[in-house]
Amino acid sequence: MSSYYSVDAILTDAQKVPCTFELTVPGLGFLEGNMSGDMKQGSKVELPLWLGEMLALSQSLNTSSLVTLDPPSALSPRVLNALKADPRTVDLRALAPHFYDLGARILELFEEEKMIEVLSDTFKARAAVIADQAHNPRGALGEGADFMRGLDENERQLFRAAHDSAKAARTWMTDLKRK
């Protein structure tokens, strides 16, 4: 669970997720673009994760939840299959800037063993490439800039940490040679 004050957590919770209303709810038609109407049972709308989660967890008098959450398109079966095939070729940032954080939040709500495995394998495979790019002195230029565009925020932090540590190690080695 991330910090309440974390900007990354706020941005992750603002990610839209598909929701299906299980009940007719008076006055919520504006979520669908109907300013004066009700939200009809069976209506599908994309809501921020925080709101969808609250509505899914809240229950009416007959103990039915107001909405059913569906996994977001960033974690659809098509994307998970692409990640299984070759995780290095998928532009995670285009899917969700906070892809892994979104995956972690969705896994808090859904029990998806396969998704856990795919996300874990994806991170491991991409981390090796990130480390390789970070240790290249020209990693942030040219080809490296294209590489950086596809990284989600966690991967960018990993890249910066690896790049800065490699740079610090080179500086340290240079200083040792001078002495």
Swiss-Prot record:
Keywords assigned: DNA replication, Nucleus
Any one GO cellular component localisation term in the record: chromatin
Any Gene Ontology biological process: double-strand break repair via break-induced replication
Highest taxon of source: Eukaryota
S-S bonds: none
UniProt main location, coarse: nucleus
Gene3D superfamilies xrefs: 1.20.58.2050
Locations listed in the record: Nucleus
Transmembrane segments: none
Function: The GINS complex plays an essential role in the initiation of DNA replication.
Family recorded in the similarity comment: Belongs to the GINS3/PSF3 family.
Assembly mode: Component of the GINS complex which is a heterotetramer of SLD5, PSF1, PSF2 and PSF3.
Protein name in UniProt: DNA replication complex GINS protein PSF3
Organism, scientific name: Phaeosphaeria nodorum (strain SN15 / ATCC MYA-4574 / FGSC 10173)
